[in-house]
Curated annotation (Swiss-Prot):
It comes from Histophilus somni (strain 129Pt). This is Mannonate dehydratase. It catalyses: D-mannonate = 2-dehydro-3-deoxy-D-gluconate + H2O. One of its GO terms (biological process) is D-glucuronate catabolic process. The keyword Heme does not apply. It comes from the Bacteria. InterPro entries: Man_deHydtase (IPR004628), Xyl_isomerase-like_sf (IPR036237). Catalyzes the dehydration of D-mannonate. Its EC number is 4.2.1.8.
Length: 394
């Protein structure tokens, strides 16, 4: 697999020199300074590409070309935003970039309640605490209708949690959930956040699927024409939250996705941490079934807790994800492609990483400190080497 590293651009505290020293050869990045919906010009794309190439790196994957909320809700100027998206794909292809990761999650890209959860070894991880999240939704945001999604016992537990929170606790939890994490392109106040949620009133799961289907049928033929492989990222966490529909969470969702738009350019970002939160998801089976459509891999593991709806980010080779089985499935697919004349490697990146060692003293992007991901990348490199020697005689 191609070893890649997510980089948030010139303002990322992790430098390109750091990336190169970590052993990555490819960079996963985006033009975060361009507002959502606007066309990425060839000039801006080439400027970023040249910045990477000056350090001996390549731009392997775009993560992400954000999808404007108007497209997801099919309101406002959504057709114009779709046309802009098509032009961005054409421009990327003309610059030699051929994998685009994106997601179709409403409002938030990913959600955690704690960005500094202390692990037994003293490192810090990201965590989703279901009780804390319920307290936020019911008693801080006070989302209309939220009580319908929680049992009386869950509401009582959330109320007890809320009652012991200080003003500082409330502010921190609110900021963690709605301020926008790395990878999210938007940040909201409580009022703005509720207004964004309100845009999805009346949009059921089935209706939301029709919106994604429309987007796919507009975009994927263009991607196919220009040689770009689109790779949708799953929902994180992979279940409905805040009354919002979620439609990329399970193996059945993946099947719907392929059936809806069967062109080869329509594929997946296989994020083991996102899919792995749901106990019913057999990740090895999913990777094997849709191997030919996996164009990018996010490798990380999560650990479900006593409350099965709560989880934290585990060490990369620990937790609930069968990383051995998933990596073997991805390598099997890579060798299959090679036998059929396609020598392109599947880009993978160590997704997230614990804040540890010297990074504990630094200001870092939550989940994206250098040393935790350095460790993850080294572990995946070793796992891949062992699998290749034992199973593939390589």
């Amino acid at each position: 697999m191609e070893q890649t590293w997510r980089w948030y651009g010139p303002n990322d505290p992790v430098s390109l020199d750091d990336v190169r020293q970590a052993g990555a050869t490819g960079v996963v990045t985006a033009l975060h300074h361009i507002p959502n919906g606007q066309v990425w010009s060839v000039e801006e794309i080439n400027k970023r590409k040249a910045l990477l190439e000056e350090k001996g790196l390549v731009w392997s994957v775009v993560e992400s070309v954000p999808i404007h909320e108007d497209i997801k809700t099919q309101t406002g100027n959504y057709q114009q935003w779709i046309d802009n998206y098509k032009q961005t794909l054409r421009n990327l292809a003309s610059c030699g970039i051929d994998i685009v990761c994106y997601n179709f999650m409403p409002v938030l890209d990913w959600t955690r309640t704690d960005l500094e959860y202390e692990m037994p070894d003293g490192s810090k991880a990201l965590r989703f605490d279901q009780v804390a999240f319920a307290a936020f939704e019911l008693y801080i945001l006070k989302r209309p209708g939220a009580e319908e999604t929680y049992s009386p016992e869950e509401q009582a537990e959330a109320k007890a949690y809320f009652d012991q929170m200080s003003e500082a606790d409330i502010a921190k939890l609110t900021k963690n959930i709605i301020a926008g994490l790395p990878g999210s392109e938007e940040g909201y106040t409580l009022e703005e956040f509720q207004a964004q949620l309100d845009r999805y009133k009346g949009i059921s799961t089935e209706k939301f699927r029709t919106h994604l289907a429309y987007f796919l049928n507009e975009i994927v033929p263009v991607a196919q024409e220009v040689g770009i492989r689109m790779a949708i990222h799953p929902d994180d966490p992979p279940r409905p939250i805040l009354g919002l529909p979620r439609i990329v969470s399970t193996i059945d969702d993946m099947q719907w996705f392929v059936d809806t738009q069967p062109l080869a350019a329509n594929g997946f970002t296989f994020c083991t941490g996102s899919y792995g939160v749901l106990a019913e998801n057999d990740l090895v089976k999913m990777a094997e079934k849709f191997a030919d459509r996996i164009y990018f891999a996010h490798l990380r593991s999560t650990q479900r807790e006593e409350n099965p709806r709560s989880f934290h980010e585990a060490d990369h080779l620990a937790g609930d994800v069968n990383m051995f089985g998933v990596t073997k499935a991805l390598l099997t697919e890579e060798y299959r492609r090679k036998a059929n004349g396609d020598n392109r490697l599947i880009p993978m990146r160590p997704d997230h990483g614990h804040q540890m060692l010297d990074d504990l003293k630094k200001k870092t992007n939550p989940g994206y400190s250098a040393i935790g991901r350095l460790r993850g990348l080294a572990e995946f490199r070793g796992l891949e080497l062992a699998l290749k020697k034992v199973y593939f005689n390589d």
